[in-house]
């Protein structure tokens, strides 16, 4: 069986992937932390073979490091590669030909990675589909700021365009209740020559935020897991502190149709907001979500299923992997954070 390599930005999903697969197969598992704030990770015996922590300011530096690392390891078969951060997806995409020679990939093709890891590009792409989406504008100039003030319904959400801008701005999502709040935030960000995205806020609490995580095979077969982000921390900021599985056939059909249309093959996740019975596309990840563990809890273990597929194992997914509803996931690392939340 093939070994597993995870290029990680955070611990939770990366360790979950290794644990899920290592519990079934006596293989070697490797975690490469990329530009992570994790200084040292002591893993339970037998679950993770090796961990390294790299700082790489560019894709070229990353490629030099992993090329050297790969040459020092002997793999009997091509290892299966998982990326658990936007940055690792983008870095791998830049050297995809080399990675396809050295690994079995679980990420989608480069066009999907490049579009959906940039919220400005993804907004343009979504408008060409049948998906509903909140009114959105990429803010590049003072005129764009004024356009939002005149044409958008408040409150609005501002968010960075990609992972690089998120580091500069310092937040994933910020809700602006008033025009004055929006103006203050927007002019402050734009003064630093940082472009960002503005969206109309879709009404509804955390329990109206839905997740749809999936693995789509090359033949079009999809195994999925869906449910509600019943608690976000901080509130309304997108980070799921607690979730519950809950199948919704309408949402499943919407998601599956969309993934088929764009030709998605690999692991990923989509966030939706429910309002008045409709589902609005918020964003998509081209990698396992940080809460991928919930798929194990729901008995649809997506990383393991991707591993089965990489090893060409025959699966009857309709019988083997049926989501169990009302299964709860709790991210204790978020629950224990103390930070003021939006009322």
Predicted feature descriptions by range:
Residues 260-293:
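Conserved metal-phosphate-binding beta-hairpin within the catalytic cores
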Residues 333-343:
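Residue-level detector of conserved catalytic or cofactor/ligand-binding positions
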Residues 1-108, 143:
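ATP-binding N-terminal substructure of ATP-dependent carboxylate-amine bond-forming enzymes
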Residues 232, 240-242, 285-299:
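Glycine-rich phosphate/pyrophosphate-binding beta-alpha loops
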Residues 303-315:
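Internal hydrophobic alpha-helix adjacent to the cofactor/substrate pocket in enzyme cavities
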Residues 179-235, 246-256, 273-280:
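Phosphate-binding site of ATP-dependent enzymes
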Residues 115-197, 206, 218-219, 249:
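Active-site nucleotide/adenylate-binding loops and adjacent lid/helix of ATP-dependent enzymes
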Residues 265-270, 316-322:
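Flexible, glycine/charged-enriched surface loops at secondary-structure junctions
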């Amino acid at each position: 069986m093939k070994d597993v390599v995870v290029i990680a930005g955070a611990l939770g999903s990366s360790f979950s992937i290794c644990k899920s697969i290592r519990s079934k197969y006596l293989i070697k598992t490797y975690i490469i932390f990329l530009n992570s704030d994790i200084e040292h990770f002591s893993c339970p015996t037998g679950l993770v073979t090796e961990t390294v922590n790299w700082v790489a300011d560019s894709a070229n530096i990353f490629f030099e490091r992993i090329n050297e690392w790969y040459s020092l390891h002997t793999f009997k078969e091509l290892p299966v590669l998982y990326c658990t951060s936007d940055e690792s997806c983008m870095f791998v995409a830049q050297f995809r030909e080399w990675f396809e020679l050295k690994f079995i990939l679980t990420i989608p093709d480069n066009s999907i990675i490049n579009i959906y890891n940039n919220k400005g590009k993804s907004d343009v792409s979504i408008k060409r589909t049948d998906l509903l989406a909140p009114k959105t504008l990429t803010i590049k100039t003072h005129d764009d700021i004024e356009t939002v003030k005149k044409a958008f319904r408040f409150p609005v959400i501002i968010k960075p365009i990609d992972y690089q801008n998120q580091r500069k701005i310092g937040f994933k999502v910020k809700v602006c209740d008033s025009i004055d709040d929006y103006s203050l935030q927007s002019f402050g960000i734009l003064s630093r020559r940082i472009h960002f995205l503005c969206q109309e806020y879709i009404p509804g609490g955390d329990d109206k935020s839905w997740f749809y995580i999936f693995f789509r095979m090359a033949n079009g077969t999809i195994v999925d897991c869906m449910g509600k982000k019943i608690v976000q921390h901080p509130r309304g900021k997108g980070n799921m502190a607690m979730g519950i599985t809950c199948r919704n056939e309408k949402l499943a059909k919407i998601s599956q149709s969309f993934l088929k249309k764009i030709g998605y093959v690999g692991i990923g996740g989509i966030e939706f907001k429910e309002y008045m019975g409709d589902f609005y596309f918020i964003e998509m990840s081209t990698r396992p979500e940080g809460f991928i563990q919930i798929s194990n809890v729901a008995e649809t273990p997506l990383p393991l299923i991707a591993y089965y597929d990489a090893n060409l194992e025959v699966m009857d997914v309709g019988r083997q992997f049926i989501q169990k509803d009302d299964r709860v996931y709790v991210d204790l690392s978020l629950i224990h954070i103390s930070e003021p939340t939006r009322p």
